[in-house]
Amino acid sequence: MSGASNDGYGQYPPQQPGDHQQQPPYPDQAYDNAAPVAPGHAADHGRKKKRQYAASAFDVGVGGNVVAGGQPIPGAAPYGAPAAVPAYGGYPAQPEVQPAAYGAQPAQPYGQPAAVSGYQAPDPYYPSAGAVPAPGGVAGLTAGFQGMNLGAGAPGGIPQQQPQQLPPQARAGPLNQLYPTDLLNQPFNVSELDLPPPPIILPPNASVTPSPDANCLPKYVRSTLNAVPTTHSLLKKSKLPFSLVIQPYAALHDLDDPVPVVQDQVISRCRRCRSYINPFVTFLDHGHRWRCNMCNLTNDVPQAFDWDAAAQKSVDRWQRHELNHAVVEFVAPQEYMVRPPQPLVYLFLFDVSYASVSSGLLATAARTIEASLDRIPNADRRTRLGFMAVDSSLHYFSVPKDTDENGETSMLVVSDLDEPFLPVPGELLVPLTESRRSIENFLTKLPKMFEHNQDNGSCMGSALRAGDKLISPLGGKLVVLSASLPNVGHGKLTMREDKKLLGTSKEGSLLQTAATFYKSFAVECSKNQVSIDMFLFSSQYQDVASLSNLPRYTGGQTWFYPGWNAGRAEDAIKFASEFRDYLSSEIGLEAVLRVRATTGLRMSTFYGNFFTRSSDLCAFPAFPRDQCYVVEVAIDENLTKDVVCMQTAVLHTTCNGERRIRVMTLALPTTTNLADVYASADQAAITTYYTHKAVERALGSGLDSARDLLQKTITDLLQTFKKELAGGSMGGGLQFPSNLRGLPALFLGLMKHVGLRKSAQIPSDLRSAALCLLSTLPVPLLMQYIYPRLYSLHDMPDNAGIPDPETSQIVLPPPLNLSSEKFVPYGLYLIDDGQTQFLWVGREAVPQLLVDVFDVADRTQLQVGKATLKELDNDFNERVRAVIQKSRDHKSKGVGSIIVPHLYIVREDGEPSLKLWAQTLLVEDRADQGLSYVQWMGSLREKVSS
């Protein structure tokens, strides 16, 4: 199946050679008949024969994938035959003319390109989809343009538009149909989390061009509702949230995710609401004017809109990027600049206290920066770097230019922490291009300068103030690398961890900032266009709760490495790899984000790491590429249009000194029908919204309040659905739409997450760091962080762990639900939440498996804990390593991230604390005061029926 991402991520195994049946039309069927070759009789296909690690002691083929359908039970129907189990949504497979359940893919032979995930054509869902358009479709569109004299000889030389077909999102047909499912009898399957959101079905000719890219892809902007209620009262009645999840960048580098760029600086905007021209406007008056799709005002089309100034010739309007693509980037003219574009500035604040030096942090950080100098964006040769060292004093470094023959880096020490002055400010920020050799020499010597430092003090707060003062004339990034609690000077913090408070109602106080300095200083930095990123490494209490305020209000991020020590190769490699990618990432500077919408809609609340400068303007001194943002939408007036639009614009300076505006336009149909609203709700976007809401609640009112919010929300949704759409009667079941079937499991995962769960064992630093991730991770990574991935490796299908012949991407085994019921004692499993990976070795794993994967014959010799899997010369080891690596691959998930998860080897009969930690990721099991999935569903049924 060439499905959502065409790369094996969350895919089912492709068809084996020799099979000619079509792909089953339902994911569950594909899932239940995934491997045509019986265990132990795998066809060779020119590769080494697959080993059966359980065969020596147990029935062949019994294991995790059997539960999921990875290996068929002997005597099962051949691949492609109708499945015995109900199809997705709990309904029998229907004839082709009937609409299939939400999420079903069209039946098609393997190798045939599938519809792109996201807003694909609704062909598989509706009988009317793809039918010849009725009069008034394409013909009407063309006739309309002819009536406007937009033929080849029209004034201005605008050629006549001749669309070949309707765009995929503008087919005729009803909105998504509602498919109720019984959550108790047809439980959630983890593979459903890989399905695209319900399709956005717009009326014919909603966009001005027939481009397939006219509407925004969900990887950039996704709505919790893909059909919008026309009234506030209907939205309120639904109990569903209406919000946008916005991730303007899908990769760390433009090359990995290019978007069309409008270079000619002709930017047409609405005079009243300031929206940018987009595929959903309409043209009037022979194409000389356009009507805004947000506020309905008629605007003049700029004279240069149909003219190429560089080539001095007229151009085809209908080829312009902004009329064909929902996501475009405009090169901004002079009026979009308050001052000349700022250069990229990094000021590194090194903790050089005893804790930092002894853990190897200083040496590793200096070495990584030195090795990454070529990767720091510097295309315009204006990038500047500065360096400060911090213990109980401030150490400034003046790095000379390479042309200074006798130039030596000089260190200046300042001990006055209350009003730290800047010695020779002009020499502290040096151009990378002009001082490259001197910077390398300095970074080589830096660890030696402090190798015998016994100072335990850290005046990081004072250092931050000095750093802000130093770079605020230009703006830029303060990069903090700290292994100790700031204990002297401004923002001094004390050890406040109190184990007696953990797990109590007072625990929330430990998650709030201990000093007002950190928020007020962060807001000041934001005004100065200074962003702060924190890399925190302490093995002791570090007050992540206070320090994380600095990135939270300045568009930065907090990275936490508990118990980090460079003496462990895995620790050193993880940080060096992540820091290297961090330094090479392209970022936006001096950025602001604003969302505009159709009249009647208003952006009411904003969530994410930024400072809200006015009611609807989010300010980012630096705009990262690995975070997402949530905006709540209010319906202030009744909506009278069939389609509403929301347009996100990010004005920023690129690393290369170019001012640009990235514009993302999302169009959604409206409805007066509650069933349409539920049938078009996006469970991943809803979960993301409530994650941000729960984090806000945890930081403001405490963890109990956050968990109560989630419990109440899911109960309200189930009760509303029962009362309004299930006829008030459910019998003994629990009805919910099939497209929201994963919501209870996701909410349970969130309530049991390390950031939110009730426990007296979780240090507050660990919780605070988890809350930072919960409120910033892009949707695919957040879903995995809340509901981790579980793969059975000992019996994975033959094609797993090797490249797909068509896409060349490694194929992953089918994911399993997070329950210990999926485990067998001789199994090998990978549990991966995107931040940490656990390789679980069963207590009865056979020697051959241990030899092939770990190169040890006896399980007791297996080293548990942080590890790097050895490269061994056998087929199975190679496949296991490929699966581990592929599971870490962010690009295939359509996101940018620097995270490289640690790999822990866990023996079922080994280190108890490590085993318990891995088991906390099994969301559907009962653990640490948390309900199992079965208990959770039972309690929800009681609440809903009471």
From Swiss-Prot:
Report any one BP term from Gene Ontology: COPII-coated vesicle cargo loading
Q: GO CC annotation: what is one?
A: endoplasmic reticulum membrane
Q: GO molecular function terms here?
A: SNARE binding; zinc ion binding
- Pfam hit, one: zf-Sec23_Sec24
Q: Disordered: where is this region?
A: 1-52
Q: Where does Zn(2+) bind?
A: C270, C273, C292, C295
Q: Where is the composition biased (Low complexity)?
A: 7-23
Where would you find this protein in the cell?
Answer: Cytoplasm; Cytoplasmic vesicle, COPII-coated vesicle membrane; Endoplasmic reticulum membrane; Golgi apparatus membrane
**Major site of localization recorded for this protein:** cytoplasm
Topology in the lipid bilayer is annotated as:
Peripheral membrane protein
Q: Which SUPFAM superfamilies match?
A: beta-sandwich domain of Sec23/24 (SSF81995), C-terminal, gelsolin-like domain of Sec23/24 (SSF82754), Helical domain of Sec23/24 (SSF81811), vWA-like (SSF53300), Zn-finger domain of Sec23/24 (SSF82919)
Annotated region Zinc finger-like: where?
270-295
Q: What does this protein do?
A: Component of the coat protein complex II (COPII) which promotes the formation of transport vesicles from the endoplasmic reticulum (ER). The coat has two main functions, the physical deformation of the endoplasmic reticulum membrane into vesicles and the selection of cargo molecules.
Q: Can you say what this protein is called?
A: Protein transport protein SEC24
What is the originating organism of this protein?
Answer: Podospora anserina
Its gene is SEC24
